[in-house]
Regions:
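N-terminal glycine-rich FAD/FM-binding segment characteristic of electron-transfer flavoproteins
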Residues: 1-312
Length: 312
């Protein structure tokens, strides 16, 4: 695979920089970073950028989208081949603005990127995860938002040093102002990094029955996830535990499903697990088409038996 001359990275979520650098170093000969403050500049320095550009803040409550004009002015002068962003809500909003201002092709939620005969090709899901599309980008600049857990994080070298430059703030024509920020309760789980996950679906009859699910997860040293109806319909679990096309994409070694039917929208998130074990009382449930191991049975009988056996 050939490499591009330069790839630039930006993320509104600092935790995503390691993944972005992992991809950028694979696809570009030189990698440049754009960050929002000097603390982030120091954090990404060990990832090996050629130079770090620090965005000048106009306001402590600045919204990410407002940096579009500042970043566009910078990139017009530098002529990169690719701008790589984290596929967050803010990241995709910023990418859309940059795509218009720089007349650049944009691919959101990319699951794979390749350089073929000097052209950037990016793969992404479509039709709610029913299919994948591969886009061949012909514009001089490609803007790609990278889905989480697609790339392995890059290694860090604490001895690496590079210059930093400040990017002047260019106010957008219509500035979106944030008046106040309030911290929400932090989630205690990141399922995308979990090695083992127990997922629960509509086969669970009551919220109190989550106790046995958590008990099984504890025995397996696993995290607990769920299908969309449990998180957004019943509100039995936090949104961060929802596995699916618009939720978490698993990369776990094991995914044990309890009472999950296996609709495609859910399996887009669960199919990345190395081993899938399904327990469902409906022998015709679609989940068994994805499972490496399947058991037709009532989770209210199977789960207590598993806990008993695994606790010995």
């Amino acid at each position: 695979m050939s490499q591009l001359n330069s790839v630039w990275v930006f993320s509104d979520n600092p935790e995503r920089y390691a993944e972005l650098f992992g991809g950028a170093q694979q696809w570009g000969q030189q990698v440049y970073a754009i960050v929002q403050n000097t603390d982030q500049a120091q954090a990404v320095m060990p990832y090996g950028p050629k130079c770090i550009y620090v965005l000048e803040q106009n306001d402590a409550l600045q919204r990410t989208e407002n940096y579009a004009e500042s970043i566009a002015a910078l990139l017009k002068d530098k002529h990169p081949a690719m701008l790589l962003l984290a596929a967050t809500k803010r990241g995709k909003a910023l990418a859309a603005r940059l795509s218009v201002q720089l007349n650049a092709a944009l691919v959101n939620d990319a699951t794979a990127v390749d350089i073929v005969d000097g052209h950037i090709c990016a793969e992404h899901r479509m039709y709610g995860g029913l299919a994948f599309a591969q886009e061949k980008i012909n514009s001089p600049l490609a803007i790609i938002t990278l889905a989480p857990s697609v790339q392995e994080p890059c290694t860090s070298d604490t001895s690496h040093q590079c210059p930093t430059e400040t990017v002047p703030y260019v106010a957008p024509r219509h500035e979106i102002l944030c008046r106040e920020r309030r911290a929400k309760a932090a989630s205690s789980v990141d399922l995308s990094k979990a090695k083992r996950v127990v997922g629960v679906g509509r086969g669970l009859a009551a919220q109190d029955d989550l106790k046995m699910v958590h008990e099984l997860a504890a025995v397996l040293n696993a995290e607990v996830g769920c299908s969309r109806p449990i998180a957004e319909g019943e509100n039995w679990m936090e949104r961060e535990r929802y596995i699916g096309v618009s939720g978490v994409l698993l990369k776990s070694d094991l995914y044990l499903t309890l009472g999950i039917s296996g609709q495609i929208q859910h399996m887009v998130g669960g199919n990345g697990a190395k081993v899938i074990v399904a327990i469902n009382k409906d022998k015709n449930a679609p989940i068994f088409n994805y499972a490496d191991y399947g058991l037709v049975g009532d989770i209210y009988k199977v789960v207590p038996a598993l806990i008993s056996q695994l606790s010995r």
